Regions:
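N-terminal amphipathic alpha-helix/helix-capping segment at the start of soluble metabolic enzymes
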Residues: 1-31, 36, 146, 150-152, ...
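Active-site mouth loops of central-metabolism enzymes
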Residues: 23-41, 85-93, 169-181, 236-246, ...
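Glycine-rich, proline-tolerant flexible connector loops at the mouths of alpha/beta enzymes
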Residues: 33, 54-77, 111-123, 129-133, ...
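N-terminal active-site wall of soluble small-molecule enzyme domains
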Residues: 61-103, 327-331, 343-344, 365-369, ...
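Alpha-helix-loop-beta-strand connector modules within alpha/beta enzyme cores
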Residues: 66-88, 137-153, 218-227, 377-379, ...
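Catalytic alpha/beta core domains of metabolic enzymes, predominantly
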Residues: 125-138, 142, 147, 169-311, ...
C-alpha cells in the first residue's frame, strides 16, 4: 500500500456513554448465543460476558419479536446494575433494525443483505444507470433507520462479510477484498449525504488474508475520501481451541500492529465469555501507543521467488525447530519436533507436523534418515554427512569462508545486523534466520526488511522470535499476532519459535504449524471453520464441532465449515468444500460448496452423513 496505515487515526463515536476510536482504548466485545426471546438466559449470559470484561455485548435480532425483546433484556440488566451498551445484530430485516435502533446503543447491519435478498451467485451485469438506481433504492431503504438512529443517538456498524456480498457487488468486483471495501464505501457515502456520522466499519472473513487485505483497502479508500470512521476487527468462523485463538490473533493482531482497529471481537466456538480473556491479551499486546514505535516506512518487502533447492520441495513456509538446549538427540527428542516413531526400532516417520530442519549444538553419530539437521559451521566442516546436515553461519563467518554447502546455508543475524556484510552473502544458496526479542524489539523485523529493500537485497527470511512465556494461550496469541502478517503478506520463507519459559519445543513446534495452517499458508491437516453461534442456532454447536472433527479430522486439505444457522451459514462459509449448517430445531443441512446436497438431517446422524457424502464424492 502506498498509504501509511499507521498514520490513520479514527474519529470518535459514542456507543451509549462509551467513546470509541481516536485515542480511546481499544474496546472489547462478544455476542450472546442464547435465544434472544429467552430474557432470563440472555440476561444471565450478558452478565457473564460483562463480568469477564466486555465493553459491549451484541445480541441477534433476526425478527421483530427479538428486536422488541431487547427492551426487556436491557431493563433486566439495568435492574441488576449493568449499564453496558448493547448491540443488535441484523441480517435481512430492516424492520427489526428500526425497532432495535430505538432500544439499544448500536445496530449492526450487513450491506450485502440489508436491502437485498440472499445472493444467488448469478452474474447480473448492470449498466451505470441501473447500478446507480440500485444505490438509490438502498438509500431509500436506509432512510428510516438513519432517522431513528439520529433521533436516539444510536450508532450503526456497517459490517461487511466476505461470504454475503450482494450479487450486484460480486458481478462488478467479484467475491474479493476490493468488493468488500467498495460495499462499505457505498453505504458510507449514503450516510454522509444524510449527515449521519455515528458509524463503525468492519470487514470480516474466515480467511485471515482476505480480512486483512479488505480492511487495509477500506482504510486506504477512507483516507482518499477524507473519512476516518472507527474500525471493528474480527475473523469469522475462527473455530475453537488453539486454531480459534491462532486464526483470530493472526488476523486481528496483524492489523492492530499497524495501528488499525478500535474495537475487536474474538469469535470462538466456545462459551462467549471465553472470548474476552483472549481479546484482552491481544489488546494488551498492541496498546494504542505501541504503533508509534513502528518504522516510518511501511514494509513492502517480499520474499524472493527464487528459492534454495531445499525449500523448493516444501509446500509452504519452512518450520525450523531449535533443539540447542537438548543435551541428547534421541527418539523422544525428535518426537518433540513433530516426528512419529516407526514400527522399526530406532527409525522415525516424518509426519505432516514434523519440523523441516532442526538446529542443534552438535551432530549426533547416528542421524535418522528422515531428519535434516543444522549445526554450527565449525561442526559441519568436520561432519561427513553433507546430505542431511547443513551449516549455520554468522554473516562474518559466511563471508570469511569459501567452503559452504552447495544447496543450503543458514545465516543467523538479528537487530544488530550489518547491512554491508549482508551484501556479500549469496542469496541463491542461503537463507537468513532473523532472531529477535519481540517484547523489546517489536518492530525489529520491519526495520530489517526495510533496510534490505532500501539496499536492493532480497533474501529468503526465517523469522525467529524468542519469547519467555509460561502460559500456552499467551504464547499462541503473541506468536500468531506477530507472525501472521508476515506470512499473509508473503514476506518470509519460514518461522521458528523459541520460548525460554515453561512452554517447550513440542508446543512451539505445534504452534508453528497451527499458525501456517490457520493462515492457510501451509496445510497439514483438515481445515475446520466454525461460527461462534448466536441466538439463531438451534442445536449444540460445540458438540457438533467435536463430532465433525472426530469423523473428518483425517481428511488433510479439505475445508469443512460447521455453521449454526441457515440465515448466515451458506454465505459466510465461503470457500469451504463442505458445510454442516443448522436448518432448524435439531436439523442440519449438508452443503457441497454453496449447494445444499442433503436437507433436514437429524443432528444425531449429521456427522456420519457428512463423512458418507465426502467419501462418495472422493475420486
Amino acid at each position: 500500500m502506498s498509504i501509511n496505515n499507521h498514520k490513520y487515526k479514527s474519529s470518535v463515536v459514542f456507543i451509549g456513554p462509551t467513546p470509541l476510536g481516536g485515542d480511546n482504548p481499544i474496546r472489547i466485545q462478544s455476542m450472546t448465543n442464547t435465544d434472544t426471546l429467552d430474557t432470563k438466559a440472555s440476561v444471565a449470559q450478558c452478565i457473564r460476558i460483562i463480568e469477564a470484561g466486555a465493553d459491549f455485548v451484541r445480541l441477534t435480532a433476526q425478527g421483530k419479536s427479538e428486536a422488541q425483546n431487547l427492551a426487556n433484556i436491557k431493563k433486566e440488566l439495568q435492574k441488576a446494575g449493568f449499564n453496558t451498551p448493547l448491540i443488535a445484530d441484523i441480517h435481512f430485516n430492516p424492520d427489526a433494525a428500526e425497532l432495535a435502533a430505538a432500544i439499544v446503543e448500536k445496530v449492526r447491519i450487513n450491506p450485502g443483505n440489508y436491502a437485498d435478498k440472499r445472493a444467488s451467485f448469478i452474474k447480473n451485469d448492470l449498466s451505470e444507470k441501473e447500478y446507480d438506481l440500485e444505490l438509490e433504492r438502498i438509500h431509500s431503504r436506509l432512510l428510516p433507520l438513519i432517522n431513528i438512529c439520529q433521533l436516539n443517538k444510536t450508532t450503526i456498524r456497517v459490517g461487511v462479510n466476505h461470504g454475503s456480498l450482494s450479487d450486484r457487488i460480486m458481478t462488478r468486483y467479484g467475491n474479493t477484498p476490493e468488493g468488500m471495501a467498495v460495499s462499505a464505501m457505498e453505504f458510507i457515502k449514503i450516510f454522509n449525504v444524510e449527515n449521519f456520522h455515528n458509524l463503525v466499519l468492519s470487514m470480516k472473513s474466515s480467511d485471515t488474508a482476505i480480512m486483512i487485505e479488505a480492511t487495509r483497502g477500506l482504510v486506504r479508500m477512507m483516507i482518499e475520501e477524507g473519512f476516518s470512521y472507527p474500525l471493528h476487527l474480527g475473523v469469522t468462523e475462527a473455530g475453537e481451541g488453539e486454531d480459534g485463538r491462532v486464526r483470530s490473533a493472526s488476523g486481528i493482531g496483524a492489523l492492530l500492529s499497524e495501528g488499525i482497529g478500535d474495537t475487536i471481537r474474538v469469535s470462538l466456538s466456545e462459551d462467549p465469555e471465553n472470548e474476552i480473556p483472549v481479546a484482552k491479551k491481544l489488546v494488551e499486546y498492541y496498546p494504542r501507543g505501541i504503533i508509534f514505535s513502528a518504522p516510518e516506512k511501511q514494509v513492502s518487502y517480499k520474499s524472493p521467488q527464487e528459492k534454495p533447492a531445499f525449500l523448493k520441495y516444501i509446500k509452504g513456509p519452512l518450520v525450523i525447530a531449535n533443539m540447542t538446549s537438548y543435551t541428547a538427540l534421541n527418539i523422544e527428542a525428535y518426537k518433540d519436533a513433530g516426528y512419529s516413531v516407526n514400527k522399526v526400532p530406532g527409525s522415525l516417520i516424518k509426519s505432516d507436523g514434523a519440523a523441516d530442519l532442526i538446529i542443534t549444538r552438535d551432530c549426533p553419530e547416528v542421524i535418522p534418515e528422515q531428519v535434516s539437521l543444522v549445526v554450527p559451521y565449525r561442526i559441519w566442516l568436520t561432519n561427513t554427512d553433507k546430505e542431511r546436515v547443513y551449516p549455520l553461519f554468522s554473516p562474518e563467518t559466511f563471508v570469511e569462508n569459501r567452503v559452504r554447502h552447495e544447496n543450503l546455508n543458514l545465516v543467523l543475524t538479528g537487530s544488530y545486523f550489518d547491512i554491508e556484510m549482508l551484501k556479500k552473502i549469496d542469496n541463491k544458496i542461503s537463507i537468513i534466520v532473523f532472531t529477535f526479542n519481540p517484547e523489546k524489539e517489536r518492530y525489529a523485523s520491519d526495520e530489517f526488511m526495510n533496510s534490505l529493500e532500501d539496499n536492493n537485497l532480497n533474501f529468503n527470511i526465517i523469522l525467529n522470535p524468542v519469547f519467555n512465556e509460561d502460559k500456552l494461550e499467551e504464547l499462541q496469541i503473541k506468536a500468531a499476532s506477530l507472525l501472521g502478517r508476515y506470512i499473509t503478506d508473503k514476506r518470509i520463507a519460514g518461522i521458528s519459535i523459541v520460548n525460554k519459559g515453561k512452554i517447550g519445543l513440542k508446543e512451539t513446534n505445534t504452534l508453528c504449524f497451527s499458525i501456517l495452517q490457520c493462515t492457510e499458508a501451509r496445510i497439514t491437516r483438515t481445515i475446520f471453520l466454525s461460527c461462534p453461534t448466536c441466538g439463531r442456532t438451534k442445536f449444540n454447536l460445540q458438540d457438533a464441532v467435536k463430532k465433525v472433527k472426530e469423523k473428518t479430522g483425517h481428511l488433510k486439505g479439505l475445508k469443512i465449515a460447521v455453521m449454526g444457522c441457515i440465515v448466515n451459514g451458506p454465505g459466510e462459509m465461503a470457500g469451504a468444500d463442505w458445510g454442516y449448517v443448522g436448518a432448524g430445531e435439531g436439523k442440519v443441512n449438508i452443503y457441497k460448496g454453496t449447494v445444499s446436497v442433503l436437507k433436514n438431517v437429524p443432528e444425531k446422524d449429521a456427522a456420519d452423513e457428512l463423512l458418507r457424502l465426502i467419501e462418495e464424492a472422493s475420486p
